[in-house]
């Protein structure tokens, strides 16, 4: 169930076979999962329920298990660069763990599956999102 979403987007597939779906709304999106049943149908599961991601600023992104997801209202954005950071226990401080360039869809939604080495070895958060236009110019930042 994706609530009153006007658009449903397939984001990716989890390692356990669950399909990850996003239901787009005007001010955010839902993330839910579904598993195949009887060969041709999909059944909603609670295995990867992430609930509602409100986007109250121009651009927002999160790490949902092993997938970066986000939405931007920068209408000229064609890609975003997401800078991830994770907690370093040895240094007792946050450190940058990666920078990922992700294409932006017509609806402003963007997503990317992280490599298992990043997703499984460190607890990541999105430190900064940089929006770029077709010319590669920075047109917005959210940090």
Q: Which residues fall in each region the model found?
A:
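Ser/Thr-rich low-complexity repeats and stalk/linker segments
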Residues: 3-6, 39-40, 51-54, 59-66, ...
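Short beta-strand-to-loop capping motifs
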Residues: 22-24, 72, 113-116
């Amino acid at each position: 169930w994706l609530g009153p979403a006007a658009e449903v987007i397939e984001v990716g597939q989890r390692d356990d076979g669950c399909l990850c779906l996003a239901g787009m709304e005007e001010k955010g999106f839902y993330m839910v999962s579904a598993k195949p049943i009887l060969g041709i149908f999909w059944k909603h599961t609670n295995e990867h329920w992430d609930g509602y991601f409100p986007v109250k600023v121009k651009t927002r992104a999160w790490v949902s298990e092993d997938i970066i997801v986000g939405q931007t209202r920068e209408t000229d954005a064609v890609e975003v660069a997401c800078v991830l950071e994770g907690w370093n226990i040895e240094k007792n401080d946050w450190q940058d763990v990666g920078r990922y360039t992700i294409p932006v869809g017509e609806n402003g939604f963007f997503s990317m599956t992280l490599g298992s080495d990043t997703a499984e070895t460190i607890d990541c958060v999105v430190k900064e999102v940089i929006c770029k236009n077709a010319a590669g110019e920075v047109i917005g930042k959210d940090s």
